[in-house]
Amino acid sequence: LVPFLGRTLGGLLARF
């Protein structure tokens, strides 16, 4: 998996 996906998921979790 590309780091972009991981970073996106991390950002979403951070918002919540």
Swiss-Prot record:
Expressed by the skin glands. The modification Phenylalanine amide is found at F16. It is found in: Secreted. The keyword Oxidoreductase does not apply. GO terms for biological process: defense response to bacterium; innate immune response. GO terms for cellular component: extracellular region. Antimicrobial peptide. This is Temporin-1Ts. The lineage of its organism: Eukaryota, Metazoa, Chordata, Craniata, Vertebrata. Belongs to the frog skin active peptide (FSAP) family. Temporin subfamily. It comes from the Eukaryota. Keywords: Amidation, Amphibian defense peptide, Antibiotic, Antimicrobial, Immunity, Innate immunity, Secreted. Coiled coil: none annotated. Its main location: secreted.
